[in-house]
Amino acid sequence: MKAAIVVFPGTNRERDMVHALKLVTGQAPRLIWHGETSLGDLDLVVLPGGFSFGDYLRSGAVAAHSPIMRDVKAFAGKGGHVLGVCNGFQILTESHLLPGALLRNAGLRFLSQDCHLKVENASSPYTQGWTRGDVFRAPLAHGDGNYTASPETLKRLEGEGRVAFRYCGADGAVSDDDRTTNPNGSTRSIAGILSENGRVCGLMPHPENLTDPEIGATDGVPLFKGLVEALVG
């Protein structure tokens, strides 16, 4: 699988993503600087976590206008696969590759903790490694992770099965108003969503940080293994 990770000033999770992808593919992905204008021949583009351009204006707002994002948009427009994690999810919404927005966390403070996610759609390349209803653990680290969208957009996301992950308790229970299960206050506990064709995915927690048993756990491995199976077979 030919993958590349886009690096912006302030990105800090690209090496974690390299490690996760290398574990499941056997080869390191390319790193592409934001100032470049061409992605080249790829199967997957990843926008990793961090604080691109210091989160000035809004998280992801400046990065969305970087030169490389023109080709990322073109790649997605042709049916290419794009994964955005944390700041990458914010960049995807700012680029209008995914609907909605990520607001300041409900508690108005930065969160760095583990959370549990419930798989809502197991038929996309990003979720096919799980079964619908599965619950897994993932770390989160963000100040602007509170997902919101218009009522019409939310209805469309739910109706089209485009909610990929929801925040939940360890038992899978979802409670929008419970900050122990929905820590940032996201609308309908939404943690990750898909594009209309299912090929663009954004989520706030970091599955790449739980892919190696030597550094904690392997809860995030199904996402990456599912991608390899979907894109390479």
UniProtKB/Swiss-Prot annotation:
Q: Which InterPro entries match?
A: Class_I_gatase-like, PRibForGlyAmidine_synth_PurQ
**PROSITE patterns listed in its UniProt record:** GATASE_TYPE_1
Please give the GO cellular component terms listed in this UniProt entry.
cytoplasm
Instruction: Give the catalytic activity.
Output: N(2)-formyl-N(1)-(5-phospho-beta-D-ribosyl)glycinamide + L-glutamine + ATP + H2O = 2-formamido-N(1)-(5-O-phospho-beta-D-ribosyl)acetamidine + L-glutamate + ADP + phosphate + H(+); L-glutamine + H2O = L-glutamate + NH4(+)
- Species the sequence originates in: Gluconobacter oxydans (strain 621H)
NCBIfam families cross-referenced by the UniProt entry: FGAM_synth_I, PRK03619.1
Query: Which one of the record's GO molecular function terms can you name?
Result: glutaminase activity
- What UniProt keywords are attached to this protein's entry? ATP-binding, Cytoplasm, Glutamine amidotransferase, Hydrolase, Ligase, Nucleotide-binding, Purine biosynthesis
Question: Is Zinc-finger one of the keywords?
Answer: no
Purpose: Part of the phosphoribosylformylglycinamidine synthase complex involved in the purines biosynthetic pathway. Catalyzes the ATP-dependent conversion of formylglycinamide ribonucleotide (FGAR) and glutamine to yield formylglycinamidine ribonucleotide (FGAM) and glutamate. The FGAM synthase complex is composed of three subunits. PurQ produces an ammonia molecule by converting glutamine to glutamate. PurL transfers the ammonia molecule to FGAR to form FGAM in an ATP-dependent manner.
The protein's name: Phosphoribosylformylglycinamidine synthase subunit PurQ
Q: Where in the cell is it found?
A: Cytoplasm
Q: Which GO terms describe its biological process?
A: 'de novo' IMP biosynthetic process
